[in-house]
Amino acid sequence: MGTMTPAQRRALYESARFARETTYNGPLGPEYTPAGTRLQLWAPTAEQAAVNLYRKGHDSPCIGTLPLQRGPQGVWSIWLPGDQHGHYYTFTVTVDGVARETGDPYARAGGLNGLRSMILDLARTSPAGWERDVRPVIPPARRSVWEVNVRDFSQDAASGVRPAWRGKFLAFTQTGTTLHGDGIHPTCLNYLKRLGVGYVQLMPIFDFGSVDEAKPLLRQYNWGYDPTNYNFPEGSYSTDPARGEVRVRECKEMIAALHAAGIGVIMDVVYNHMYRYENVLNNTVPDYFFRQNEDGSLSNGSGCGNEFASERPMARKYMIDSLLYWAQEYHIDGFRFDLMGLYDVDTMNAARAALDALPGGRDILMYGEPWQGGGSQLHRYEANKANLAMLNERIGIFCDDTRDAIKGGCFNAREPGYAEGKPGSFWDVGGAVAAWCRSDRLPPHAPSQIVSYVSAHDNFTLWDKLLCVRYERPEFTASDPVALAQNRLAAGIYLTSFGLPFLQAGEEFARTKKGVGNSYHSSPALNRLDWARARQYHALVDYYRGLLALRAAFPRLGTTDRHAPEALQFFSLEQPLVGWALPAAPGDGAWWRALCVFYNPTDTSRVVPLPAGRWKLLSDGTSSSLWRGESRTYEREALLMPYSATVFGAV
């Protein structure tokens, strides 16, 4: 094709002719059989392509280079006879006379730091009983998400996890762990089972480039939003990153253990950008997979130097094939899309349709961040809040409107929200309760499309935010009764709202990062889950636990019915109090005929009128488990504690 400038490449890639002549719908990557392995690589602009063979995934010489044969649609392939399980390889792809050695972008395993790809018999990586592993059945009423980083989960020495497994996939498989091994205070998987969350959302577990797997991890840390290989797990989370099959097997063992505990696994996927410009996709088809400005330079809507061109046919195929692979091979239960606003609506809906076609695929969750990290050259409908009505009803969005209404803006540490007493914010809290289905702030949507939350890995933890609002110089490790009450109030609001409830791991035990608002590469010590705080703040943990169970006992809050929020009846109360009632849906198995809920963000007790009838106190400002016993019933009026969410059930 001759030497081309980036601008010329852009014109070529966006031409109908290129799409027509190069779009390929078949399998790519390694296809293993005991008799031999076929490698297939899509590289339509390449003049030559060859495979380089290695015995090891690092520090070993090339033992041979073989040419690939070009076929239709620009697919290059080669048949390697014999059992190739455990063998490593790279490609050398020549474009415009420049030869680049690269890993296989379609590889399913790799060596140290993912620099070399690996051929695997995937059946040999499956743990015992894997063929019987199935996705837990989690009805909408029980859906809730607990977000955690693999390292954070268990790297605390007090976690009770065996030292070799701390910060690893295998930490999720160890049962019966307790704080310092005391046999009393549960940690890790033991803790999760007791907490009662429906899903664990794992921050990036695919192979990323910001941690060197060849070096000790003692001082290394990164969240992992730096993809290098999309289709196999990160090696630093395995017990042996040099052996490519180990990370695959141990990741499956983690998922199997969570499934056995009745917990679904949601994977945080970051297709929107790659770690560096020199990457497996760009080395194979320069500039094709990344959105370009008119002059051919890279668009940077991710804020990371590049952004994925989801609208280009083979980029869309790459992303959807990857999702399907994780869902099928690893039994993933859901996907959280980082910077989902960088994908076009058509790609997201096509991904939903592809997952739906799998056995049980309609139960796989999809939701993401409906924003971008900068200006983008995406000139199609973006998968953002403004286009929510164009997305499939089973694609959700993180709702920053809910987050900011409850706890205050995330970019100003001292800006209060409703829980901290911000004047006028009660209007937005009403919108949040209804999942914004009764507001013109968002296009028409189902309540289940709204991810209701107040904290995630980005920005301040809820505890740190509450203290920053209250104090000019907070003492983050000190206990604070008012902040604790405000924490309970914040949880009480989003856990009694329509939508999908979501919390950052440790929010329920006042997790602190000591005021660090972006800890993506801070120390392991700062980022770890401090399991001693789960003991210290056990009453707060129990408050979350009780609300999660209470929510499950009133299924209408988790409904997918877009008309359900219309049944909410809001009360006329003295500002800034908020109160509402919601009847149970007929035949949904609710424990109570209706819920009546009040929020009081003030520092004084308040008396409020109750609707007609008898109302059992289910949860007040300190205990969310009153409904489990013979709690008091009320008629006509009730007293609200300061900084409280109070829940009644009609009896």
PLM feature spans:
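Active-site-proximal helices and loops of the catalytic beta/alpha 8
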Residues: 64-70, 218-219, 224-225, 339-444, ...
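The feature marks proteins involved in alpha-glucan
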Residues: 1-34, 70-174
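Conserved, mostly hydrophobic/aromatic
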Residues: 41, 91, 148, 202, ...
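Structural beta-strand segments of beta-rich domains
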Residues: 35-39
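Loop/helix patches that line or flank the sugar-binding groove of alpha-linked glycan CAZymes
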Residues: 444-616
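C-terminal beta-strand-rich structural cap/linker in extracellular carbohydrate-active enzymes
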Residues: 43, 86-87, 630-651
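Substrate-binding/active-site clefts of carbohydrate-active enzymes
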Residues: 151-330, 336-359, 365, 376-377
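Glycine-rich phosphate/pyrophosphate-binding loop
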Residues: 109-158, 397, 401-479
